Amino acid sequence: MSEQRSVSVIGLGRVGLPLALCFADRGLRVLGVDHDHGVLDSVRSGRMPFMEAGTQGLLERVQRSGRLELSDRAADAARADDIVITIGTPSFS
């Protein structure tokens, strides 16, 4: 990615996307990875794919900063210094 510290977040759901946005807002270069092209298209167009208080403004700010990159390829995550995996887990209830 660059000389600036970077992190990849795999899974841009209700945990991963807000986390990725917070990392980017704090100055990290972030690669967000998700297999769902609907999610990626929504984020690229500046729209949150779900309702979460405060995240729409955060997404807009992060997009202006240029610190968020998106990919549908999990292998791209290896370019970052650190990787966080936030994928759904099954419910046993």
Whereabouts are the PLM-identified features?
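Structural/interface elements that position substrates and couple domains in central-metabolism enzymes
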Residues: 1-93
